[in-house]
Amino acid sequence: MAHLLGGETLHLEYPTGVVFDSVTVGVSEGDRIGIVGRNGDGKSTLLGMLTGRITPHAGRVTRRSGLRVGSLDQTDTLDPGHTVGWSLVGDRPEHEWAGDARIRDVIGGLVADIPFDAPVSTLSGGQRRRIQLAALLIGDWDVIALDEPTNHLDIQGITWLAGHIKQRWARNAGGLLLITHDRWFLDEVATTTWEVHDRIVEPFEGGYAAYVLQRVERDRQAASIEAKRQNLMRKELAWLRRGAPARTSKPKFRIDAANALISDVPPLRNTVELSRLATARLGKDVIDLLDVSVAYPGSQREVLRDIEWRIGPGERTGIVGANGAGKSTLLGLIAGSVTPTSGRVKRGKTVRLSILDQQSSELDAVAGDMVREVIGRLQTSYQIDGKDLTPAQLLERLGFARDQLSTRVGELSGGQRRRLQLMLVVLSEPNVLVLDEPTNDVDTDMLTATEDLLDSWPGTLIVVSHDRYLLERVTDQQYAILDGRLRHLPGGVDEYLRLTEQRAGSTGSNAPAVRTETAPPQAKSGAELRAVEKEISSIDRSLAKLADRISGKHDELAAHDQSDHVGLGKLTAELRELESQVADLEARWMELSELLE
C-alpha cells in the first residue's frame, strides 16, 4: 500500500534519559494503528514526532507530498473568547455547514447537548475536550492522530466515535494513529497495534485482543521477560478467549493455538469462594435503596426517581449512563454523602465502604511525604490469591518501580497517584468498594494489573465507568441510569446502547445522525453466504492438515543428521513452503470472514 507518513531511525533523548533509539515506523494507506505502552514510555512523544510537533534529535520524519495531517493532543487549544459554533465551523454560513452530512454527523454524535452560542469560557473541561475533538473531525485529513480521544466521552459517544472512524478511515483510505487506554475502543478500531517499550516500537497485527495473543506468544518464547508480566497477560488472554471469542479475527487455526496456550489457566474468579467470603465479612445485609428519589434544592427536576436496589454481599455491579444522568448522585446515596428527597437508604451494620473517586483528594494531606513513608504507616501485608504481599510489593504489582518509592506524593504523575490511591483504598480493607471512573490516567498494563487485583477481592464491588471493556471484565451484572431510573441490563452494555438508540428515535432527539456518505454494501444472498461458509470450512480443514505436516516436518528436522547441511537445507525449504501455504490460506480466511460480517 502507498506510504503516507513515517519515521526513519528516530532518536530522541531528554536529560533524564533516551526515549527512542533508532526507531523506524511507517503509516500506509488504510492503516489504523493503536499505540499502547506504559505511561511515561513515550507514546505521546512518538505521536508528536510523527505529526511534527516534536523534532527528533536524529533521524527524519517522511511525508507524502501534500499530506494533510490532523492531530488531537491532551492540551486545551480552544480560544475562550469564541463561541462553541465558531470553534466548530468558524464563520461559515449555517446553510453551508448544515448541508454537509459529515458535519451534522459529528455535531450530533459529540456535542449535540452543548448550545451553539455558548461561550467557550463557560464550558467544563469535558465539554471543551469534546468541542476540540469535534472540530478536528469536521476538518479534512488524510492522516489523523488522536491522543486519548475517549476522555470525557460516555459509552454512547465512544461507540459513535468508533463507528465514525471505521467508516471514514476505512480499509485502503487514509491513516489513523491512536493512543487510548480504552481497550474495547482499541480493539474495535485498530487493525495494527504498536507497543512502545524500552526505547523501541514493536508492531503487532490486529487490535487489542490479537495484540494480547501475540504478546503472550512473544513472552513465552523470550526467557528474559519477567514471569509476573507474562502471567498477567495470559490471564487477560484467558478472559478474551473464554468470554468474547469474536474479539479477534484470527482464523480457527490460530484460535486453537490460543486455546491450547490457556488450557491450564484457572478461571478468573472463584465466584463461589468469593461469595462465601463476602457473606462472612458482610452478612446478608449490605446497602438497600428503597423507593429513593433525589431532587436538588431549588430544582423541581428529580435527578433520580423511584430507585429500588438491594445490593447483596459479593455482588459485582457495573453502572452506565450518559454524562449528567445521575451516576455520581447514585454513588453519593450509596456512600451516604447525598440525602434522598424521598425514600430511604438502609445500610448493614457491618458495612465498611471505601470509594475511589476522580479527585484523589485524600492524597493532598500527604503531598509532602515520600511514598515509602505513606505505605510504612499501613498494615504490613495484604493477601492476594493466598499470598502475603507487603505494601511495596503491592505497589510493584500495580506498576510502581522501586526507585519511585522515594518520590514525594505531590510530585507523582496522574497515573502514579491513581496507583497509590487504589492501593490505599484496598489496604483500608473495606467490604464494599466503589470505583468511580477508575481508568482515568492509567495505561493498559495498569488496567490489567488492577483487574487482576480485583479478581481476588472478596467484597461487594460497584464500578461506574465509560470503559465497557473494564465493566465486562470485572463485573458480573450491569445497570443503567435512564431517565432518572435504574434499569437492570441482562444483555449488558449492548442492551444499553440499543435502549438509548430506541429512546433517541422515539423522542426525535438530536442523536448521532445516520451516516449517508456511502451506501451500505448490498447484502449477499443465502446461496452466496453458504458458498462462503463452505470455503471457510474447507480452509479450516486444510489448515489443520498443514499444522500436522508442519509439526511432522519439525520432528524430521530434529531427528535429521545435523552434519548433513544439504539435507537440513532441503527440509527447511519444505517447512518454509508449508508455512507460506498457511499464510496464504489465513489471508483468504480473513477475506471470507469479512464477507460474513
Residue map of PLM features:
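Alpha-helical coupling/stalk and coiled-coil linker elements that connect catalytic or binding modules
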Residues: E236-P245, E273-T279, I287-D288
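ABC ATP-binding cassette signature C-motif
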Residues: M1-S224, A278-E597
